[in-house]
Amino acid sequence: VRKMHACETMGAITVICTDKTGTLTQNLMQVHEPNFYGLKDGGKLADDDISRLIAEGISANSTAFLEETGEGEKPKGVGNPTEVALLLWLNSQKRNYLELREGARVLDQLTFSTERKFMATLVKSPLIGKKVLYIKGAPEIVLGKCKEVILDGRRVDSVEYRSTVEAQLLGYQNMAMRTLGFAFRLVEDNEPDDCVALVSENNLNFLGVV
């Protein structure tokens, strides 16, 4: 026992609820409510720049894979369950994550850690012909590294929009939902290929919450 107060907590328990996978749960995560503020329909990708950035960011800033199954069956995920859920959502939006991932050349990457609470990947994007930094992680952490929030057709200061995001997060938390925040930043060619340095500038653009 690392913390003694845990013993007191365990001693106060009177009922333990357990579950066998397949009865209450399915050992599967799925995207419930994507909320990307820059999309006209926050839950659906379209044929615009923001949609392309979202799709490329989810594809490249991930280490999970989907394995093909029998005809008519849903692809099987391999890797982090949260990332698998995001790839399955992309698949439902008719986006080929593998083509997007293979097309975006990775220049630098920060894998997720419990200390940082985010993952970041810098790629050379063939979609826009520039370097792009993608980041996903705990929404409050990701938002704190952003200068602006991308809305439909405009940008707002992230400080002004923070209360709106926090209210949405509280709603998701009350429904026992796990949430992720997404952000990006266009990077000039003369800037270093260093995720740590780029993220620390707190100059990202917040895309939304899933």
Question: Where in the sequence are the language-model features?
Answer:
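Conserved cytosolic headpiece of P-type ATPases
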Residues: 1-210
